[in-house]
Amino acid sequence: HPELSLAEERTTSDIANQLDAMNIPYERPLKTGLVATLRGTAPDAYREDGTPRRRILLRADIDALPVTEQTGEEFASVNEGCMHACGHDCHIAMMLGTLQILRHMTDDIHGEIRIVFQPSEENGQGAKLMIGTGVLDGVDGAYAAHIWSEVDAGTVSCEPGPRMANTDWFRIDVRGTSCHGAMPQRGHDAVMVAAEIVNALQTIVSREISPYEPAVITVGELHGGTARNVIAGTAYLAGTVRTYGDKTHEEMPELMRRIVEHTAAALGAEAELTDYTIANYKVENDAASSERCRQAVLKCLGPAGEGHYRGTLSGEDFSEYLRRVPGVLAFVGTRNPQIGATYAQHSCFYKIDESVLAKGSMVAAQYAIDFLAEPTQEELDGPTIAAVAETNPDLAAKLRSAKATAAEARDAMHDARTARHAAIKGIHDARAAARHEEKRDE
């Protein structure tokens, strides 16, 4: 019974029933999705004021895709036109398995685990909605896993650096002059112009971006024309852009705008980049979190379980969490040709090797335990400053001041990054509005 983004009502209820059976408390801050809490019972799990000494967020997305399943499996979707073709049902299963493990190990949990069953990943809204409810308040790190059809079953890949791409959406409108299909010289063919723009856009990737930097511009829609014997007067294109590089991501709208407008002008028509929307920022694993995850894989699966994957230009809104706290996205491999588990994500034939689910659950549980067992920065710094204070109070005061300044600097850097992204979007919107006004004045 898969359900589309923001309509995951039965899915949410099913998850709630499982949590009830495990006696794990949860809240429903949104119409769909929920947030559970697992409290550690280690002696140092909570401070005297009742706050956890350390808190980690584990996230599983829960929505499906508008795809009609054709796997023929007995458990195939019964909801016409809706399928878990990206494996989010597996993410739910792995997370519930992780909780089954952890609820019997609370004495080993030196803090608190916040589990987010997130709606609406596929349309890029869910993470922002959940974060808006405060799920990242007091969180020190985040973890998520994505089953992946290009990684061998039984292995987990969690390398550092970019793992999933900046994901943007665009629309281009073309205006020509319609005329009789037998008299093309009397008009300007918007469909032909649109086709030229499709080809011209590819020169951005091949000639303006380093060949060592991954980038993709895909036109997924081209619509134009009203009749077979009429030269089309209008057409529009829609598609997606995927990038890793920050500079490329920032410059892409202007690169596309130049190509679009000049290509159309050369053919006697007009074209405009009427929409350019940032859907998701790239998912980037920090080095410390990646190494912690690698160690969890080795502990649970041994050396044979360590997978290696280059990353993908697919997008994921888990990036919204990682823009705010350190963390890791792990790829849990599902590829197994022996059982036909080779189809890519989003295919109507998509299936997985289900034996990997328990392994994914174990790695997530181990990661959470290891993360919470690590000393906090306060614990690392506190004794040192206290010891200094016994012999040199002035120096101790300076150390405390420096620590506070460093914390302020980290906050300022985060605020600056957020402001930069907002400014880029503002520039794009302002330019689009100005061009719209110019066209209207003409």
Indicate residue ranges for each PLM-predicted region:
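Alpha-helix C-terminal capping segments
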Residues: Q100-M105, T133, L322-R324
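Divalent metal-coordination and catalytic microenvironments
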Residues: L58, H88, I115, M130, ...
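Acidic/His- and Gly-rich active-site-bordering loop/insert found
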Residues: H1-H84, D89, A93-L96, Q100-H110, ...
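Metal-dependent amide/peptide-bond hydrolase catalytic core
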Residues: A195-T405, A409-R410, H414-R417, H421, ...
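Non-cysteine beta-strand/loop elements that form the S-adenosyl-L-methionine
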Residues: L57-R59, F170, L329-R335
